[in-house]
Amino acid sequence: MILEIGGKILDALRLYIGTGHVSGLVEADETFFRLSYKGNHSKSKGFTMTRKPYLRGPKSKKSENEEPKPRGISRNQVAVMCAIDRTGNIISELICNGRMKYKDVERLFKGRIEENSTLCIDSHKSYIRLDNNFDVDIQKIETGKFKKGIYHIQHINSYHSRLKKWMDNFNGVATKYLANYMYWFKWIELFKTDKDAMKCKRLFIQSHASYSNTRIKDFKNRKPLYI
């Protein structure tokens, strides 16, 4: 019951905050979380795992049926794309499983990045057509480099570092709830300079500003929320 109440609050916050919009000098990069079916298969009659389970504990005690952990980026990882501009606007969305493609990046930024903005990115090939299709100036930071003149992606890397550290507190989040956690952290970042009393006031008002009609059974049957 506590999970469902918390989920309704986060649903309402997500609806209130929205995906967002960035402009000016923008940094963007993706980060990854392991695909998790936590909460789906326990006592479930209709759920089937799409892979073998990951088991914990000493290697000698692990089952032969355990799925080997893949190296690099695989379909068992969820890509979360984040973008931040210099005025503090944030976009943080689940975009795909595994390696992202141009169509995923295009879907995220369509209608959400101002024309004539400068987008600082890494050398991933998925960004290659953004400058022509979105009328933005692309500044690529090559692998192994920290900056390119005045351009860098240190703010977005720092955001990802804080996000991962914060997510460690939850010991694994089911992928079907991951979008809400991205918005929860986004909310924390947007109002991190507020005093605690103001944060409580904002949380109360904003969580009631948008109506969420999600029922308990909807949480159990929820699908991951990709942009």
Walk through the language-model features, giving the residues of each:
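Residue-level recognition of single "structural anchor" positions
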Residues: 1-227
